[in-house]
Curated annotation (Swiss-Prot):
Catalyzes the hydrolysis of N-succinyl-L,L-diaminopimelic acid (SDAP), forming succinate and LL-2,6-diaminopimelate (DAP), an intermediate involved in the bacterial biosynthesis of lysine and meso-diaminopimelic acid, an essential component of bacterial cell walls. Homodimer. Pathway: Amino-acid biosynthesis; L-lysine biosynthesis via DAP pathway; LL-2,6-diaminopimelate from (S)-tetrahydrodipicolinate (succinylase route): step 3/3. Its EC number is 3.5.1.18. It catalyses: N-succinyl-(2S,6S)-2,6-diaminopimelate + H2O = (2S,6S)-2,6-diaminopimelate + succinate. One of its GO terms (molecular function) is acetylornithine deacetylase activity. Belongs to the peptidase M20A family. DapE subfamily. Zn(2+) 1 binds at H66, D99, E162. This is Succinyl-diaminopimelate desuccinylase. It is an enzyme of class 3 (hydrolase). Keywords: Amino-acid biosynthesis, Cobalt, Diaminopimelate biosynthesis, Hydrolase, Lysine biosynthesis, Metal-binding, Zinc. The gene is dapE.
Length: 377
């Protein structure tokens, strides 16, 4: 499988698929899958292309990934051209090499090879591929999941090929993620001259005690799977830029990464209580990016642990840290979900790269997961 994985990865990297422009990546994948009998369904939404490819019937094991990449930044800082896909000393360089065209290629080749060997396999193998993960993530996996739910089509197990490894390939499997919710808070005051404060009402001064309470509040203590919920102020703005004008409004944007000990409703209620307690005039808009999810040790987690250990000779650690991913959408279907892929040390950076031996092992691991899960059905 190694040569096929590397060749496909290079072909994908050579297509400059800056989110959400797929640039023909999914068509390349679709042709391979169709050649071995996969049924293809194109699910475009807005400016996003999505592919749902399936083979077989029964319990569904899905591989999920994205063809889109982040912008390259300053091209002159790259040692090798970002869309050239050059291999130097066993490292494949290019935007998307690690996040996540390499793992995507490994998934495709693993599924293709499995179907060639076992065309009448048990269950259903699926690939869910989107071009909208790195940017808005509004017309990609979330829309495909909504479509599948509407027609009662189920995903039982899902492996997302995000680059989960931290310091050594295979050291981490993600079996959950924290939730993410953002508050956009507008606190009203009365604008005026700084020399006449009695004729104005400074929203910055009024909000200080509230902000102190908000940033020091302990939401929970976490649990055995998640660290404690954390809140960070991301942006804050008030005033006109002049030193003699009391601002009429204060804008505060804050984000919480929250564990399973709280819910988004608990968070909203508590923040509202604080605002009312401090008698502020305000408007708050909430944006829920994703709810927390956890896949406990069971068939998928155990199969992934076994496969990674077999091909890396290390025992991976189960982890729920980091940001959000498309796994959060798939988890809403009741699926067991894990994320596993190459090292994440160079993702989104200049000179993004991946070890080609790691990609080959990725393919072997994904193949072994298929074998293990189908044998247990």
């Amino acid at each position: 499988m190694k040569n096929n994985i590397i060749t496909l990865t290079q072909s994908l990297i050579q297509r400059p698929s800056i989110s959400p422009d797929d640039q023909g990546c999914q068509q390349l994948i679709a042709e391979r899958l169709q050649a071995v009998g996969f049924k293809l369904e194109w699910l475009p939404f807005g400016d996003t292309l999505n592919l749902w490819a399936t083979h077989g019937e029964g319990k569904c094991i899905a591989f999920a990934g994205h063809t889109d990449v982040v912008p390259i930044g300053n091209e002159s800082q790259w040692t090798y051209l970002p869309f050239e896909a050059r291999i130097v000393e066993n490292m494949l360089y290019g935007r998307g090499a690690a996040d996540m065209k390499g793992a995507l290629a490994a998934m495709v080749i693993a599924a293709e090879t499995f179907v060639k060997h076992l065309p009448n396999h048990q269950g259903k193998i699926a690939l869910l591929i989107t071009s909208d993960e790195e940017a808005a993530a509004t017309n990609g996996t979330v829309k495909v999941v909504e479509t599948l739910i509407k027609r009662n089509e189920k995903i039982d197990y899902c492996v997302v090929g995000e680059p989960s490894s931290a310091t050594q390939f295979g050291d981490i499997i993600k079996n959950g993620r924290r939730g993410s919710i953002t508050g956009n808070l507008y606190i009203q005051g009365v604008q005026g001259h700084v020399a006449y404060p009695h004729l104005a009402d400074n929203p910055v001064h009024n909000a200080l005690k509230f902000l102190d309470e908000l940033t020091h509040y302990q939401w929970d203590k976490g649990n055995e799977f998640f660290p404690p919920t954390s809140l960070q102020i991301a942006n804050i703005h008030a005033g006109t830029g002049s030193n003699n004008v009391i601002p009429g409004e204060l804008y505060v944007q804050f984000n919480l990464r929250y564990c399973t000990e709280v819910t988004d409703e608990i968070i909203k209620t508590k923040v509202t209580e604080m605002l009312e307690k401090h008698k502020l005039t305000y408007r708050i808009d909430w944006n829920l990016s994703g709810k927390p999810f956890l896949t406990p040790q069971g068939k998928l987690v155990n199969a992934t642990l076994e496969a990674v250990e077999k091909f890396t000779q290390i025992r991976p650690h189960l982890d729920t840290g980091g940001g959000t991913s498309d796994a959060r959408f798939i988890a809403t279907m009741g699926a067991e979900v894990v994320e596993f892929g190459p090292l994440n040390q160079t993702i989104h950076k200049v000179n993004e790269c991946v070890n080609i031996d790691d990609l080959a092992k990725c393919g072997e691991i994904y193949y072994h997961i298929l074998e293990k899960l189908f044998n247990e059905q």
